[in-house]
Regions:
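N-terminal DNA-binding recognition helix of tyrosine site-specific recombinases/integrases
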Residues: 2-9, 35-69, 120
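Basic, Lys/Arg- and aromatic-enriched nucleic-acid-binding interface segment
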Residues: 41, 45, 64-119
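Catalytic-site neighborhood detector that most strongly recognizes the C-terminal catalytic loop/helix
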Residues: 83, 144-148, 180, 228-235
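Basic/aromatic-enriched alpha-helical hairpins
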Residues: 1-37
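Flexible coil/turn residues that form the inter-helical turn or adjacent wing/linker of helix-turn-helix
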Residues: 37, 104, 115, 198, ...
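C-terminal catalytic core of Y-nucleophile DNA break-rejoin enzymes
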Residues: 78, 145-189
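Short, charged phosphate-coordinating catalytic segments
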Residues: 56-66, 112-135, 222
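C-terminal catalytic core of tyrosine-transesterase DNA break-rejoin enzymes
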Residues: 60, 110, 114, 120-121, ...
Length: 235
């Protein structure tokens, strides 16, 4: 195990007293995994989390006098933000599939790219969630599922309006309803057929909304953050 290797590397011993596990030990372990073992920060955090569980048990059994993790904060893993470029988004919009279900999934994904809605929010949209303001702009008014906070999104782009019109039917729901698992599976097929190597998910669609759609149209970052339902701009 990594912890045994580290102890031998640092102390040239197979074991050490638990009371030697202080804050510096954790920091050194983190550095060792990064530099000597070339681990990613995600992997490092998992290994440190396992050590934390051992310390928790040791504390309960009074085998250690203090908690070395008291001041420790896991380091943030750098994640690559994935979103579609304008060219990729245009390619997706222009593509017509022979399969009706693929066209439906494509349309729902594009709708998300132009509204920033999550999966459950999008597929639970009802006609009653749409309201027009004094200027005639159509808005979505709904509660965000994760936080149960009300949110509103103006439909300022033609794409979501065209999609709503396309699927206007007797149903109370705005869009075709597709299970999450099936939706994601068909998104893979769509990406493959277009030669897009990025993973298409609702998360990718929200990032596309924030970057390609909003920021590239010179919409202020504060507005982008608000439309995505973030309490902080950095989220």
């Amino acid at each position: 195990p990594a912890i045994k290797d580290f102890i031998f590397f640092k102390y040239q011993k197979k074991d050490i007293n638990l009371n030697k596990l202080d804050f510096n030990f954790i920091e050194d372990f983190d550095y060792y995994l990064k530099t000597e073992k070339n681990n990613s920060q995600v992997t490092i955090n998992k290994k440190i989390q396992r050590l934390k569980k051992v310390i928790k048990v040791a504390r309960k059994q009074k085998l250690i006098d203090f908690n070395p993790f008291e001041e420790h904060k896991p380091k943030q893993a750098k994640t690559k933000i994935i979103f579609l470029t304008q060219d990729e988004l245009d390619k997706l919009k222009e593509k017509e599939f022979q399969s009706e279900i693929l066209n439906k999934v494509r349309d729902c994904y594009i709708f998300c790219c132009y509204t920033g809605l999550g999966y459950s929010e999008m597929f639970s949209l009802k006609k009653s969630d749409l309201k027009k303001d004094e200027d005639g702009t159509l808005w979505i008014y709904k509660e965000r599922q994760k936080t149960e906070r009300a949110f509103s999104i103006p439909l300022i782009f033609s794409e979501p309006l065209d999609i709503i019109e396309k699927y206007n039917s007797e149903s109370e729901y705005l869009l075709p309803r597709i299970s999450n698992q099936y939706f994601n599976r068909l998104l893979k097929e769509i990406a493959f057929s277009l030669g897009i190597t990025k993973k298409l998910t609702h998360h990718t669609a929200r990032k596309t909304f924030a970057t390609t759609v909003l920021l590239n149209n010179n919409i202020p970052i504060e507005t982008v953050s608000k439309l995505l339902g973030h309490s902080k701009i950095t989220t």
